[in-house]
Amino acid sequence: QPYIGTVEVGNADGPYVVVNDFTFNTSDGDDVIEYGETVTISMDLKNVGSELTSDVNVTLSIDDAYILMLDDTDSFGDIAPEETSSIDNAFSFLVAAEVPDNYSFTIVATVTGSGQTWDYNLNMTAYAPVLSFEGVSVDDPDGQLDPGDTVEIGVIILNSGGASIAGPMAIFSSSDAYITLNSSDTYTMLDIHPDMEEMAYFNLTASPDTPIGHIVSFNLQVISGFIYNSNLSGSLTVGLTWEDFESGSFVTLPWNFSGNADWEI
């Protein structure tokens, strides 16, 4: 992304070098800074002063748990008044796999030349996937898992983050005594792009002894390569579930309440 901002030139008598603009390139070529990526920075400097600025050097620095500078210095030589000096891929940094989504950070560019020093902020944003469990699709004529059924389920996962996750593997686990996993516990999913849903498929059998309305809890670990790991919790109800309030309370289903008044039947 080009650097856009206001440069306070002050008194431009003598040498005065500014960051004219900068662009970055990401390791996957989409120009979006994402988790686990190596990013290179190309920079263009301009001498807006009235004198030659000699031996111009730039050092980039940042104190951030999610950003690591890999190549932080470069020399831009001498720059005459109103002239520019550019270097492609002059600097590079690594984004941590754990970076939060929509994470803003600032790299400080310290420019030196002719005994002068100028600091400029390079503002950028990094993105990461944000996965959540959105429900279960049951491949059965009545659309539900009943006691004694063997069905294929599709666990629906939403990515509400700003970065895609490529070819993730979903690992299913459950300690529920009424459920038997017939398929592999690992399913390789399609890429999950921002604001998109994808499914992980597994084959399950519910014991004939499973109580109607029993809620099966499970975990889904989603991993991609060595850089992404997310643990999700989900649930699936066995049999048709309804609320007739004959119990005289709200214990049949996990109701949520709001407001200040007491809820009663």
Language-model features: where?
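Short, solvent-exposed loop/edge segments of extracellular or virion-exposed proteins
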Residues: 20-29, 134-142
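Short acidic, flexible loop segments centered on an aromatic residue
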Residues: 46-67, 74, 158-180, 184-185, ...
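Intrinsically disordered, low-complexity Pro/Gly/Ser/Thr-rich segments with frequent PxxP/GP/PP motifs
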Residues: 68-99, 180-210
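Extracellular glycan-recognition surfaces and repeat-rich motifs
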Residues: 244-265
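Terminal connector regions
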Residues: 1-11, 92-129, 205-239
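Short, solvent-exposed loop/linker segments at the N-terminal edge
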Residues: 28-37, 142-149
